[in-house]
Amino acid sequence: MMIICSDNIATNMIIDYLGLDTINACIRELGFGHTVLHNPLHFDRYDKLGTTTPRDYAALFAQVAKGTLVSKEASAAMLGIFRQQHYNTMLTHDFPQFYLDCEETGEPELIWVASKSGSMNACRNDGGIIHTPYGEYVIVLMNKEFHDIIEYNDPPAMVYGARVSRMILDQILACEGKLYLK
């Protein structure tokens, strides 16, 4: 529930059960040195809920994709959960639907996404693994100072993120997955 539906009640139940210190120790042990959970997810009570960086977020998804986060089995289970996540609009909104939706044909999806989004106050974030016919890549989009109302269609942060995500996908597909940075 806490990943697929972004249910903060489920998240807070885990926080209450394990405790912030235990969770933060695990985060550090996994190597995410710039990520901290400051408080339970009560938006009306706390100004600072958590801190992370694009690098830590990308490293998390890279390890899940490689099967090296905790174990191969745990990574595979996490990947399955991230693939079911409901709120991936920032990553997929501008993707051609014929890549993502093969329910009518019964064929496997050409592109699938395993991601986790989040928003708080003026921050809009999404990150995950994009699987293409040419391989997988990790993308993380973190926006701040977007004082839009996310309840309406196409808020600016989502539109901006979707455009960036589509530009990256187009380059991956055009180069058949062979992108080289010099």
Q: Could you describe each region identified by the protein language model?
A:
Residues 8, 47, 151-154:
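Active-site oxyanion-binding pockets that recognize sulfate/phosphate
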Residues 6, 41, 143-145:
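Short, histidine-centered active-site or binding-site loop motifs used for metal coordination
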Residues 60-99, 106-110, 117-182:
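Structured C-terminal helix/loop/strand segments within mature extracytoplasmic catalytic/sensor domains
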Residues 6-7, 19:
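Membrane-embedded alpha-helical core segments of multi-pass
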Residues 9-10, 34-38, 87-92:
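Secretory-pathway/luminal and periplasmic proteins that interact with or process carbohydrate-rich
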Residues 12-69, 73:
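Mid-domain, small-residue-enriched loop/turn segments at the edges of structured enzyme/sensor domains
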